[in-house]
Amino acid sequence: MTHNIHDNISQWMKSNEETPIVMSSRIRLARNLENHVHPLMYATENDGFRVINEVQDALPNFELMRLDQMDQQSKMKMVAKHLISPELIKQPAAAVLVNDDESLSVMINEEDHIRIQAMGTDTTLQALYNQASSIDDELDRSLDISYDEQLGYLTTCPTNIGTGMRASVMLHLPGLSIMKRMTRIAQTINRFGYTIRGIYGEGSQVYGHTYQVSNQLTLGKSELEIIETLTEVVNQIIHEEKQIRQKLDTYNQLETQDRVFRSLGILQNCRMITMEEASYRLSEVKLGIDLNYIELQNFKFNELMVAIQSPFLLDEEDDKSVKEKRADILREHIK
């Protein structure tokens, strides 16, 4: 069976050329409505559905997906595509609004009433902020958004009060991971109000040496200041990753090549493989491509990291396990 991984990928994720380190960027704005209790305090589901209806009416050009009308697998696919958070699934009255290419999504009734997301692979944080801000303006025209003149936007979590903005950049950092530098980097940037998390944010697991770098606090800084400082932090991490890769290539070339080609051999020949192992093998092959050790036709690290996740492997009506199907996809697309 041929597996068309493009069918499982949001349009914004598809790219002809992948960069060595930056995978994607995201801007998220948290907003709440006046005269409504916060989602975690709803007395009944109807409280949540009223908010869903109000937000949907304010954004008529977006497609509404109510989570109570979806099965668990469909919800998990949306998590894998970063359209919703794992936390949204836990809410009894939750929904998401998405645009055509799924680069913009509006989560309704997560921790806050509204969470606007703008995502892109080759788009600057400033451009993504402009897109998210445009949606925010559209909502503000018809909804009463909670705002305090001194504090800024009022949110459920105190760390989001102020701009209500979280800016984040997804980075592929195999060099720093292999050399065990990530703990030091995380401690350093934490002192400046920034954090490093797993692929799906707070509390999530790290897969394939992939990390999300984002701001922690939003109070007392403008959106532009947050974006500028995060960009500086990300650029410094990228600089260190490049230095480590150069050292691996110069002083540990044989060991690094052995690591790369072992992973390539496993991916091209495996018959069963877990998500965790597959992600790290893919990461090492990507490192080998970036260091010009190997050349593969149409190798798409970002797309494969989504396509091999369990929710996308449960559709096919056969008796194969998820591990077998994952191995089939990898052998088919890594040649």
Curated annotation (Swiss-Prot):
GO terms under biological process: phosphocreatine biosynthetic process; stress response to cadmium ion; stress response to copper ion
Keywords assigned: ATP-binding, Kinase, Nucleotide-binding, Stress response, Transferase
EC number, as in UniProt: 2.7.14.1
Binding residue positions for ATP: 24-28, 82, 115, 166-170, 197-202
Entries under PROSITE patterns matching the protein: PHOSPHAGEN_KINASE, PHOSPHAGEN_KINASE_C
Catalytic activity: L-arginyl-[protein] + ATP = N(omega)-phospho-L-arginyl-[protein] + ADP + H(+)
Pfam families listed in its UniProt record: ATP-gua_Ptrans
Induction description: Up-regulated by heavy metals such as Cu(2+) and Cd(2+), but Zn(2+) and Co(2+) have no effect. Forms part of an operon with ctsR, mcsA and clpC, which is repressed by CtsR.
KO phenotype (gene knockout): Hypersensitivity to heavy metal stress, temperature stress, osmotic pressure stress and oxidative stress. Deletion of mcsB also results in sensitivity to variations in pH and lowered expression of the clpC operon under adverse extracellular conditions. Additionally, virulence traits such as hemolytic activity, proteolysis, biofilm formation, and evasion from peritoneal fluid killing are substantially reduced in cells lacking this gene. Interestingly, mutant cells also show a significant reduction in expression of virulence determinants hla and saeS.
Molecular function terms from GO: ATP binding; creatine kinase activity; kinase activity; protein kinase activity
One Gene Ontology CC term in the entry: extracellular space
Domain Phosphagen kinase C-terminal: 21-244
Subunit comment: Interacts with McsA and CtsR.
Family statement: Belongs to the ATP:guanido phosphotransferase family.
Its job: Catalyzes the specific phosphorylation of arginine residues in proteins. Is required for stress tolerance and virulence in S.aureus. Acts as a modulator of the repressor activity of CtsR upon heavy metal and oxidative stress caused by these metal ions.
NCBIfam families attached to this UniProt entry: PRK01059.1-3 (NF002193)
Name by which UniProt lists this protein: Protein-arginine kinase
Organism of origin: Staphylococcus aureus (strain NCTC 8325 / PS 47)
Lineage: Bacteria, Bacillati, Bacillota, Bacilli, Bacillales
